[in-house]
Amino acid sequence: MSDTVRVELGARAYDVEIGAGLIASAGARIAPLLSRPKVWIVTEETVAALHMDALRAGLDAANIASEALVLPPGEATKSWPHLQRIADWLLSERVERADIVIAFGGGVIGDLAGFAAAIHRRGIRFVQIPTSLLAQVDSSVGGKTGINAPQGKNLIGAFHQPSLVLADIDVLGTLMPRDFLAGYGEVAKYGMLGDAPFFEWLEANGPAMAKGDPALRQEAVRRSVQMKADIVARDETEQGDRALLNLGHTFCHALEAATGYSDRLLHGEGVAIGCALAFELSARLGLCSQEDPSRVRAHLAAMGTRRDLSDIPGDLPDADALITLMGQDKKVVAGQLRFILARGIGHAFVTADVPTDAVKALLTDALAGR
């Protein structure tokens, strides 16, 4: 039994379907959107090897033809050269404005293929079929698309909403444990930023979910997507509440840049570490009790995910250099860096009133613990 979360955006509203077996039935679910019985799939090598046959079988069952472009896996793919490769491919395939592209992969593919759809012929529709936990609960929903720049993450892109999202819970069983736990950083973030009862639910059910319980996985994805859908409906282009979804990301993006967007630090791992740092900073500023960052770290430890700078292998820059990297964050307004801090678990807020000295002291202490 699948769940459906509606992202209410007027004429551009769409459904996020969550459940088992959705790839096998993808053709029937996508068919009503098509102007002609053909789709163009953008994916990556790992996903193609694991799941392309199932997707093609699902499309064939609905008499939908398909072409596919298979890219290398990894964060480095979210770049100008691969965006140009997709753009050239869509043009060579004569993809029309009424056609649909399928983004079939994790967050990298969703962001990249979505951006290509946004700029091809000034915008065509696309469907997200996210294959990682991180993509299912976060990046596939809300219309943020884009690529990384040498100066920072996600600095080039567009808001372009999908027409449909199919989150197949079955594919989560094929993830490596590290990839699943990286995505879990985004799940826990939702509880931390605005839903204390959900965080309590995760404390009770997270370990069993990580071990593979499908019902718990579906419920965790549903609750995460529902929270994101509600926030996106209120603030699609991040002028207000949507910035709350960046809890942990100011630290995370600096750490990702410092590690060269490599597998030294996966995005969801950076989010988990960033959330722990944000709560620690909040406690130091007297905004929440010290019990809150301790509880956050205890839960991340119970899940076995990364939670401290000491969990990142290799060298890191000093505190000043990390703060400089934070200055490239998209949340900078009038030259001022905005942080998402918390008055407690489930009570995040956005502020620019953060002393740089406090951030430097926090990072200096965290680096000293490595």
UniProtKB/Swiss-Prot annotation:
Binds 1 divalent metal cation per subunit. Can use either Co(2+) or Zn(2+). NAD(+) binds at residues 107-111, 131-132, 144, 153. Pathway: Metabolic intermediate biosynthesis; chorismate biosynthesis; chorismate from D-erythrose 4-phosphate and phosphoenolpyruvate: step 2/7. Its EC number is 4.2.3.4. The keyword Lyase applies. Coiled coil: none annotated. It catalyses: 7-phospho-2-dehydro-3-deoxy-D-arabino-heptonate = 3-dehydroquinate + phosphate. InterPro entries: Dehydroquinate_synthase, DHQ_synth_AroB, DHQ_synth_fam, DHQS/DOIS_N, DHQS_C. Gene3D superfamilies: 3.40.50.1970, Dehydroquinate synthase-like - alpha domain. Belongs to the sugar phosphate cyclases superfamily. Dehydroquinate synthase family. NCBIfam families: aroB. HAMAP family: DHQ_synthase. PANTHER family: 3-DEHYDROQUINATE SYNTHASE, 3-DEHYDROQUINATE SYNTHASE, CHLOROPLASTIC. Catalyzes the conversion of 3-deoxy-D-arabino-heptulosonate 7-phosphate (DAHP) to dehydroquinate (DHQ). This is 3-dehydroquinate synthase. It comes from Jannaschia sp. (strain CCS1). The lineage of its organism: Bacteria, Pseudomonadati, Pseudomonadota, Alphaproteobacteria, Rhodobacterales. The gene is aroB.
